[in-house]
């Protein structure tokens, strides 16, 4: 993918643009330079235009190569811009006795020193807060999202952190030369001078830039002259084309030379025509047969389409050309066309490489992990109360002093008491008064500590938490460690101004099966208009990684509930951000509203609304997403309900767990699925199947040898079908087998969650029944908790204890409950295999969110449209005799430590044995299952044989050192769902040690 350049230079097309610097208009045809910033209202970059001189007052480009379109400027303007960029001074060195240049004074303004006005700013060295009244130092930068949009962003530093980073920040002078130094107190001035002494000139880094001027060798001098001559000839033609030729004649000239005219951009059309007259006609693209090439940096890029989803973007440095042929009638009309040469020539370009930071930003934007963490540059020990929240009850005369002491120790003072308050500073007298705030503190279990607590912490900076317990003066208090806020790690996405303050998922009010978008403000007085088979509500999407687009567009025709009044509501923007806008239009009649709705649909998709069932994707247009909004009132909270459940407590807790809406939402968020545009359960099963097919297609492309154009095409389709939240980062190209496996697992989870959601939707909330009992009835599975004192429980516990592998020691497994499982119809389905020899009780693990689907439909084999990745022995149902091997598939963590596992009776019969991966499409006639033999296994001589002949391989593990196998542990695979009879469900607690 092409590097996204931060600036754009061109000649003003009209005289209407206003300079963002001086606020005056920019005259037509004068050179103007733009900062390309993200629009707050559309999923696109927009130019903030400046006069040339105003631009350099507001921005500090590091390289002329960061300026898009510079190669299409006049030679003199290229030269001037290069000189201006080169003259920007980025470092401040000691200039004793020297007259300071304008560039030096401009650079000096980017630095400053002062006392922190609050405790809100963050040091960009150590990423810790800078407390109020501490000395802080500023470097204003211009290459950040904020800096580019607002003409600079001040980045603050502690004095010690700035001193360590001074070289890369570009400050080599003494600290006393920094603006603001004189405003500091004498002792702070001394600290600054000591921390930031001047650096000798001979120790300065080489800051010279590569200049545009070439060295004086004959060859390079000739190249420079050729560049100038070509540029002059090019602009002679361009000026004549712009000032003299009619557009229809330009089109005739281009088409006569088999060049497809650029549409929608007159200036690019002039560029294309001038290039034709100066250098000759470019041959058609070998990839897509397009006849339209656009100048791009130091070459030409094909403007054709690989498919309706993807641009071709083939890049040519030196395209094959033929001589430009001018029709006689045009020569007669335009005299300058008689000067066109009859021999094609090669266009040479100046090499303007982008700055390293531009490369870096581009690499970060294309990083496969869009949550790349921002790590501190400077290690710094956190103050003892860092990020801990304190409050005060009473002690009114000492509030100001106590607040300052808390903040000096790194803590935060908050008037409001909350569950995140670590402790409250007060007195025994205030405890006896039992004020409302004190009672609330007792309810939350927050410790009350005296003022002396701060004395202890100031004397012993490592014992803050222990002093909360030891100095506590109240009779209550939960573990203070539980109230320590988790360290928040910043990511590239969270740093963006367009991903902060994102709205939480909203409740949709459903009327007649259709939801009114709450952003319309009409959800209480209107409903979605329905006309025969037409439901006038659509959600459109488009992901295009070549243009960094991840857009949505929603349109609804709404009718007032009580009168003849109609509205068209539409909203649009970038998925996962606050970029976007909306519009509400009122109509008097349904016909005018329908006409407007259909016009919008046709404009955005290129399809007529009446033909939506035969939808054809159009190049650059949007695609409908099948999202079905249902009544969110059915997503009840299980904590309290009017009707008492008839289920055992352990079964109630299990049903709560597997039907937990928050867990399902968290799972979708882990996969970066956009929860605003695609709330839980709203994506159709058909759309999920389509996504499976796209992922399988990507797998086939990789198997046949990676083809970037095909991968981009399929990636665009996948992310359009399944909206993902990439924030402002570039959507990730799907190009590895690991990504395919991750997406397959995501779609598996989506499919299972869709089952759970369908069950919830089908329930009648008006029933005089607890929702847990409703859920339980819907899964059609009997669950009975085993007595923990029974022999059956003891045998199964031994199976867990003995088969935990030595390579899986990051956690221990604690059994919370074991349930005997009887799925409706499964025993009957399994009956033919009950007579088969070699039946074992084996483990299977899966995500929590998959268990509604598993219990209601049984364990299933991946659908045909799913890619074959992740299946070592083909698509089947996988089991293990080592508990921890299956436990790893529960996808638990220290934060989400509850997992569910199954023990199933598996009819293995005659097994095809393998010691390495072998993809099996179909077993041979005399085999019933596949056995991947691992080197470590439960001791087969110690197995327990049940009365019905089923083997429980619960022996202690042994290792066969002589076996040549690539597998660590045994795997068992069956390819017929009828060979599985689920018998037990374990609720496990994963006790992580690290």
From Swiss-Prot:
Keyword field contains Ligase: no
Compartments it resides in: Nucleus; Chromosome; Nucleus, Nucleolus
GO biological process: Cajal body organization; chromatin organization; DNA damage response; dorsal/ventral axis specification, ovarian follicular epithelium; double-strand break repair; heat shock-mediated polytene chromosome puffing; maintenance of protein location in nucleus; nucleolus organization
Tissue expression summary: Expressed in adult female oocytes, anal plates of stage 12 embryos and in cells around the central nervous system in later embryos.
EC number: 2.4.2.30, 2.4.2.-
GO molecular function: DNA binding; histone binding; NAD binding; NAD+ poly-ADP-ribosyltransferase activity; NAD+-protein mono-ADP-ribosyltransferase activity; NAD+-protein-aspartate ADP-ribosyltransferase activity; NAD+-protein-glutamate ADP-ribosyltransferase activity; NAD+-protein-serine ADP-ribosyltransferase activity
Occurrences of domain WGR (ranges): 525-622
Residues reported to bind Zn(2+) 1: 19, 22, 51, 54
Top-level taxonomic group: Eukaryota
Residue span(s) of domain BRCT: 380-471
Keywords tagged on the record: ADP-ribosylation, Chromatin regulator, Chromosome, DNA-binding, Glycosyltransferase, Metal-binding, NAD, Nucleotidyltransferase, Nucleus, Repeat, Transferase, Zinc, Zinc-finger
EC main group: transferase
Residues where Zn(2+) 3 binds: 285, 288, 302, 312
Region (Automodification domain): 368-507
InterPro entries xrefs: ARTD/PARP, BRCT_dom, BRCT_dom_sf, PADR1_C_dom_sf, PARP, PARP1-like_PADR1_N, PARP1-like_PADR1_Zn_ribbon, Poly(ADP-ribose)pol_cat_dom
Protein's job: Poly-ADP-ribosyltransferase that mediates poly-ADP-ribosylation of proteins and plays a key role in DNA repair. Mediates glutamate, aspartate or serine ADP-ribosylation of proteins: the ADP-D-ribosyl group of NAD(+) is transferred to the acceptor carboxyl group of target residues and further ADP-ribosyl groups are transferred to the 2'-position of the terminal adenosine moiety, building up a polymer with an average chain length of 20-30 units. Mainly mediates glutamate and aspartate ADP-ribosylation of target proteins in absence of CG1218/HPF1.
Family: Belongs to the ARTD/PARP family.
Name of this chain's protein: Poly [ADP-ribose] polymerase
Organism: Drosophila melanogaster (Fruit fly)
Record gene name: Parp
């Amino acid at each position: 993918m092409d590097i996204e350049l931060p600036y754009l230079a061109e000649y003003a097309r009209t005289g209407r643009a206003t300079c963002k610097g001086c606020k005056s208009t920019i005259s037509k045809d004068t050179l103007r330079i733009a900062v390309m910033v993200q629009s707050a209202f559309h999923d696109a970059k927009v130019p903030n235009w400046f006069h040339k001189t105003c631009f350099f007052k507001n921005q500090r480009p590091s390289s002329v190569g960061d300026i898009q379109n510079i190669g299409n400027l006049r030679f003199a303007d290229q030269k001037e811009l290069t000189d201006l960029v080169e003259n920007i001074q980025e470092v401040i060195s000691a200039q004793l006795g020297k007259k300071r240049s304008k560039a030096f004074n401009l650079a000096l303004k980017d630095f400053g020193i002062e006392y922190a006005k609050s405790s809100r700013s963050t040091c960009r060295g150590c990423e810790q807060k800078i407390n109020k009244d501490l000395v802080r130092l500023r470097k204003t930068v211009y290459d950040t999202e904020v800096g580019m949009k607002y003409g600079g962003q001040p980045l603050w530093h502690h004095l010690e952190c700035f001193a360590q980073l001074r070289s890369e920040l570009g400050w080599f002078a003494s600290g006393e030369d920094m603006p603001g130094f004189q405003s500091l107190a004498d002792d702070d001035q001394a600290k600054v001078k000591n921390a930031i002494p001047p650096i000798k000139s001979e120790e300065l880094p080489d800051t010279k830039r590569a200049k545009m001027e070439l060295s004086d060798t004959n060859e390079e001098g000739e190249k420079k002259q050729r560049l100038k001559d070509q540029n002059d000839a090019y602009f002679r033609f361009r000026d004549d084309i712009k000032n003299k030729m009619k557009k229809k004649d330009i089109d005739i000239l281009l088409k006569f030379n088999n060049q497809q005219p650029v549409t929608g951009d007159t200036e690019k059309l002039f560029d294309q025509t001038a290039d034709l007259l100066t250098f000759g006609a470019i041959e058609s693209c070998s990839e897509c047969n397009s006849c339209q090439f656009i100048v791009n940096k130091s070459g030409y890029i094909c403007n054709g389409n690989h498919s309706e989803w993807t641009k071709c973007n083939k890049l040519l440095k030196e395209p094959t050309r033929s001589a430009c042929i001018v029709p006689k009638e045009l020569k007669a009309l335009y005299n300058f066309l008689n000067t066109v040469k009859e021999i094609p020539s090669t266009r040479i370009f100046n090499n303007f490489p982008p700055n390293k930071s531009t490369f870096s930003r581009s690499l970060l934007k294309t990083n496969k992990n869009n949550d790349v963490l921002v790590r501190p540059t400077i290690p710094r020990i956190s103050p003892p109360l860092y990020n801990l929240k304190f409050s005060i009850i009473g002690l009114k005369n000492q509030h100001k002093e106590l607040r300052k002491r808390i903040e000096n120790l790194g803590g935060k003072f908050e008037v409001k008491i909350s569950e995140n308050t670590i402790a409250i500073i007060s007195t025994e007298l205030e405890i006896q008064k039992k004020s409302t705030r004190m009672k609330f503190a007792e309810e939350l279990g927050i410790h009350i500590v005296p003022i002396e607590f701060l004395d202890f912490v100031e004397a012993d900076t490592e014992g803050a938490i222990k002093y909360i317990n030891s100095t506590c003066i109240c009779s209550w208090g939960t573990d203070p460690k539980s109230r320590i806020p988790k360290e928040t790690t910043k990511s590239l996405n969270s740093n963006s101004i367009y991903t902060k303050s994102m709205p939480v998922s909203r409740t949709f009010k459903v009327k007649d099966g259709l939801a009114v978008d709450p952003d319309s403000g009409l959800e209480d007085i209107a409903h979605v208009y329905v006309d025969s088979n037409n439901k006038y509500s659509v959600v459109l999407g488009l992901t295009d990684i070549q243009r960094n687009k991840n857009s949505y567009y929603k349109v609804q025709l709404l009718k007032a509930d009580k009168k003849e009044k109609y509205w068209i509501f539409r909203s649009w923007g970038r998925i996962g951000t606050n970029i976007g806008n909306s519009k509400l239009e009122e109509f008097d009649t349904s016909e005018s509203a329908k006409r407007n709705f259909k016009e919008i649909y046709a404009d955005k998709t290129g399809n007529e609304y009446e033909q939506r069932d035969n939808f054809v994707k159009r190049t650059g247009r949007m695609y409908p997403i099948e999202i079905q909004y249902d009544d969110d009132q059915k997503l009840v909270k299980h904590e309290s309900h009017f009707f008492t459940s008839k289920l055992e407590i352990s079964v109630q807790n299990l049903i709560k767990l597997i039907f937990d809406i928050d867990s399902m939402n968290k799972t979708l968020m882990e996969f970066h699925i956009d929860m605003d545009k695609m709330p839980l359960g709203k994506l159709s099963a058909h759309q999920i199947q389509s996504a499976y097919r796209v992922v399988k297609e990507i797998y086939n492309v990789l198997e046949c040898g990676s083809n970037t154009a095909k991968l981009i095409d399929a990636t665009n389709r996948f992310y359009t079908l399944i909206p993902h939240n990439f924030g402002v980062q570039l959507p990730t190209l799907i190009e590895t087998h690991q990504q395919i496996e991750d997406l397959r697992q995501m779609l598996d989870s989506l499919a299972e969650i869709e089952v759970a959601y369908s069950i919830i939707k089908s329930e009648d909330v008006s029933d005089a029944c607890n929702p847990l009992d409703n859920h339980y009835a819907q899964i059609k599975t009997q669950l009975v908790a085993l007595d923990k004192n029974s022999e059956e429980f003891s045998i199964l516990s031994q199976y867990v204890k003995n088969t935990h592998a030595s390579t899986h020691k990051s956690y221990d497994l604690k059994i919370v409950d074991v349930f005997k499982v009887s799925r409706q119809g499964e025993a009957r389905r399994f009956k033919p295999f009950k007579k088969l020899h070699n039946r074992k009780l084996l483990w299977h693990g899966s995500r929590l969110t998959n268990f509604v689907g598993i219990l209601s439909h049984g364990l299933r084999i991946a659908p045909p449209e799913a890619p074959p990745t992740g299946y070592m022995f083909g698509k089947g149902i996988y089991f293990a005799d080592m508990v921890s091997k299956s436990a790893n598939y529960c996808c638990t963590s220290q934060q989400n430590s509850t997992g569910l596992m199954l023990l199933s009776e598996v009819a293995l019969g005659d097994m095809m044995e393998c010691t390495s991966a072998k993809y099996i499409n179909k077993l041979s006639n005399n085999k019933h299952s596949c056995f991947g033999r691992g080197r470590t296994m439960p001791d087969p001589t110690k197995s327990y044989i049940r009365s019905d002949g089923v083997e429980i391989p619960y022996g202690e593990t042994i290792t066969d050192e002589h076996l040549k196998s690539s597998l660590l542990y045994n795997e068992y695979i069956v390819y017929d769902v009828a060979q599985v009879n689920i018998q037990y469900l374990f609720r496990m607690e994963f006790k992580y040690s690290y």
